[in-house]
A protein has these predicted regions:
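Active-site-adjacent mobile loop/cap segments within catalytic or ligand-binding domains
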Residues: 188-202, 212
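Hydrophobic alpha-helical segments within soluble ligand-binding/sensing domains
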Residues: 154-157
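Intrinsically disordered, low-complexity segments enriched in serine/threonine/proline/glycine
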Residues: 8-11, 20, 26
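Short, Lys/Arg-enriched N-terminal segments with co-localized hydrophobic residues
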Residues: 25-42
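Nucleotide and nucleotide-moiety/phosphate-recognizing core
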Residues: 38-149, 159, 163-170, 179-185, ...
């Protein structure tokens, strides 16, 4: 038989609940600790850069969203809109570890606050638990580079995340440049849609290149900045 002895106290954000349990021989005290307002879990976050809305769904700027959609579909995961976090979230398992796929509901250049909210809520360490997937205008389409940390390199979405979390987190940069960029300004180009051929190649990239990189990240084996994949 157990009974609550009225002893609940707070230490910082951790509450301690003591329960007195009686058996036929002795009394014992069970102490339970739990976090207030946050959850501490062993998990990883895959955070995609992109813009919400159907009009942006197949655009170059939404490369990160497209990649996570493919990952979710491959594992039969379902997206859920979480207004608390201002994000669409799906859960998958990679190497037996829980991984949350995140598509922020803010626009591309304002994603940092959402990333910070998730990291704080789950008490994660960005340098170990956060991987951002985004398009990279400076790289040719079909090229993937891994970066372990660093400046935004002119990417406003990364600039926003850096402002809220610092620069020490991993990124997968997916090249989107092609010759059409030479006759378009940057804003129009990144918001232009992939061709049918490019969409097929992007699917192949996700399956054969990006997915193995994600597995490496989960295992703590993601290769450093010099790592480059060309297709």
């Amino acid at each position: 038989m157990c009974g609550y002895n009225g002893s609940i106290h707070s230490v910082s954000k951790v509450r301690v609940l003591q329960i007195v349990c009686k058996t036929s021989i002795y009394y014992s005290i069970i102490t339970i600790k739990f976090q207030c307002g946050t959850i501490e879990q062993d998990m990883k976050l895959l955070f995609a850069q992109g813009n919400p809305g159907r009009q942006y769904a197949r655009t170059r700027h939404n490369t990160g969203f497209i990649a996570l959609d493919a990952l979710a579909e491959a594992q039969g995961a379902t997206w859920s809109t979480q207004t608390k976090f201002r994000a669409d979230i799906a859960e998958i398992s990679v190497q037996g570890e829980k991984v949350l796929l995140i598509k922020p509901l803010s626009f591309y250049n304002e994603t940092g606050q959402i990333a910070r909210g998730l990291v704080d809520f789950y008490k994660l360490e960005p340098s170990e638990d956060l991987l951002v997937i985004h398009d990279e205008l400076a790289l040719p389409f079909g090229t993937i580079r891994v970066r372990q940390k660093g400046s935004d390199a002119g990417n406003n979405g990364i600039k926003s995340i850096n402002a809220h979390l610092g620069e020490n987190y991993a990124r997968i940069r997916v090249g989107i440049w092609n010759e059409r960029h030479d006759i378009m300004d940057d804003a129009d180009f990144v918001l232009s849609a992939f061709s049918e051929e490019e969409s097929k190649l992007l699917s192949t990239l996700v399956e054969t290149k990006i997915t193995p990189l994600i597995s490496a990240f989960v295992k703590g084996e993601l290769e450093p900045v010099s790592h480059k994949l060309d297709v």
